[in-house]
């Protein structure tokens, strides 16, 4: 079963578990076919004569304990692993082939209902695993109860999550690649457009726009590698670990692993049911990637402002004002900036859940899903937004070139000229600082200073005014950066070739 694409973003109020509000949608499942749990109070469950307990669960505990409102998005993984598990049980002689066929047929009907949105959820469905088993038993009869042979919800849920995380990491790699292609295309289009480079948001040194954009390409390349690592770390099958100590049947975990696309099985049952490292890996990769997107968003907000005027965002990714008709607001870029701490928060919060958690399974681990699911949704949405927005940005070559024409950003080049004339760099730095002060105090450009004024600062520099004025030409500033990875056109072209190779070497 191929997992369906993650649904749109949800708030905690949508889930209806942290705020106490009624859940109006079921993330990952049908929107209106089931009861409004957990926001609606389920009635107290009747106790079975075989129950361990003397009184039923309190309704508020049922609401606290239930995860069905958010974990039902795992149904594709749950059905797939149940199907593989049933086949393995029959192949090992643990259940009959007739029981296997009945289970497979019943799971097919369950899958159809879930896909079509007709699955009859009930308010006493604690989680997606129990909902699937309950419905399977309604369809197939008592044989449905055989499916849980040699399986615990402890290894069942972590298997679902490993499959979901693996598939999400694969999607992230594809989506990041798409954004990398957009960045590379825009860098190629603007390879030789001068602009200021900044430190402390102050003009520092001139660069080419293509060079600047390629910085994001390499950030994204590292992000893609992190998700490839996450995919690999999600590739060990936990199913067969049982509750924690293994199971009392001679199962074939390798068969199930192969059927579900896992590379291997977890070698230790305790670690298998209690480990959530692969979720932390995804959250970490998503947090770093979201931080990179936030930096892109922040720059687009600045650059599209009237004060900078370096670019105009596409109308399709902008909004207006409810009161000021002239406004064109960079909302999409601002949200790229604002979504990052949300994902970082999920990483921090889930580290807190896992911190000092005794082995093996604890109900604390139920919290893994919301942190993971919302991070997946947020990242996929922001990656799509970043690509769509950046593809349509119109850059203003004249404004960028004019901003990069400020002679003050040639100060380092003047210092390097003095170094070539024999001065130690630290001394040259001081000389140029004095030259800048003279120009600022007199309200003139560096090129407007007279020979005597330059001589007062440093006689050696006054003897080389022709070289000084050559350094003050914009093309000289840019093309002097000849080191590998630098901003000279030759070096930027090298970076473009490396970027194309990066995409070609890891072609999907």
Identify the role of each PLM range:
Residues 22-24, 29-30, 35, 44:
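Intrinsically disordered, low-complexity segments enriched in serine/proline and basic residues
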Residues 1-15:
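Extreme N-terminal basic, low-complexity initiation segments
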Residues 45-246, 250-257, 317-320, 335, ...:
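A helix-coil-helix interface module used to build multimeric assemblies
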Residues 161-166, 173, 181, 188, ...:
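Charged, flexible cofactor/metal-binding loops and thiol motifs
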Residues 85, 106-113, 135, 139, ...:
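Generic, well-ordered alpha-helical scaffold segments in large soluble proteins
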Residues 45-81, 143, 309, 324-508:
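Glycine-rich cofactor/substrate-binding loops
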């Amino acid at each position: 079963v191929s997992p369906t694409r993650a649904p749109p973003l949800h708030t905690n109020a949508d889930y209806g578990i942290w705020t106490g509000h009624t859940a109006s949608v079921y993330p990952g499942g049908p929107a209106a076919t089931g009861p409004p749990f957990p926001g609606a109070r389920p009635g107290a469950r009747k106790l079975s004569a075989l129950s361990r307990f003397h009184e039923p669960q309190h309704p508020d505990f049922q609401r606290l304990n239930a995860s069905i409102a958010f974990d039902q998005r795992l149904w594709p993984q749950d059905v797939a692993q149940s199907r593989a598990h049933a086949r393995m049980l029959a192949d090992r002689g643990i259940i009959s082939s007739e029981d296997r066929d009945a289970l497979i047929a019943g799971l097919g009907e369950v899958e159809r209902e879930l896909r079509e949105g007709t699955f009859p959820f009930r308010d006493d469905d604690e989680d997606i695993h129990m909902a699937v088993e309950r419905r399977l038993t309604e369809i197939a009869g008592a044989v449905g109860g055989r499916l849980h042979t040699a399986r615990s919800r402890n290894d069942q849920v972590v298997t679902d999550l490993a499959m979901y995380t693996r598939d999400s990491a694969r999607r992230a790699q594809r989506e990041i690649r798409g954004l990398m292609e957009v960045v590379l295309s825009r860098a190629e289009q603007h390879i030789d457009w001068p602009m200021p480079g900044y430190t402390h948001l102050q003009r520092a040194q001139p660069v080419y726009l293509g060079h600047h954009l390629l910085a994001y390409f390499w950030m994204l390349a590292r992000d893609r590698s992190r998700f490839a690592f996450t995919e690999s770390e999600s590739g060990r099958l936990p199913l067969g670990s049982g509750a924690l100590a293994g199971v009392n049947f001679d199962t074939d975990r390798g068969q199930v692993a192969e059927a579900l696309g896992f590379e291997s099985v977890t070698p230790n049952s305790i670690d298998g049911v209690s480990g959530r490292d692969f979720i932390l890996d995804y959250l970490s990769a998503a947090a770093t990637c979201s931080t990179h997107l936030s930096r892109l968003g922040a720059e687009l907000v600045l650059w599209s402002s009237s004060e900078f005027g370096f670019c105009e965002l596409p109308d399709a990714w902008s909004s207006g004002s409810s009161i000021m008709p002239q406004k064109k607001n960079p909302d999409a870029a601002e949200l790229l900036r604002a979504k990052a701490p949300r994902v970082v928060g999920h990483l921090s919060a889930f580290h807190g859940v896992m911190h000092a958690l005794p082995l093996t399974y604890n109900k604390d681990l139920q919290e893994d899903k919301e942190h993971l699911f919302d991070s997946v949704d947020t990242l996929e949405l922001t990656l799509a937004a970043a690509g769509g927005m950046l593809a349509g940005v119109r850059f203003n070559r004249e404004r960028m070139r004019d901003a990069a024409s400020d002679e003050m950003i040639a100060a380092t080049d003047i210092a390097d000229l003095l170094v070539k004339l024999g001065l130690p760099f630290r001394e040259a730095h001081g000389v140029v600082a004095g030259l800048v002060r003279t120009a600022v105090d007199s309200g003139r450009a560096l090129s407007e200073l007279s020979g005597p004024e330059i001589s007062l600062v440093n006689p050696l520099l006054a003897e080389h005014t022709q070289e000084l004025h050559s350094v003050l030409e914009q093309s000289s500033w840019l093309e002097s950066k000849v080191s590998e990875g630098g901003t000279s056109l030759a070096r930027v072209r090298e970076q473009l070739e490396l970027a194309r190779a990066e995409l070609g070497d890891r072609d999907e």
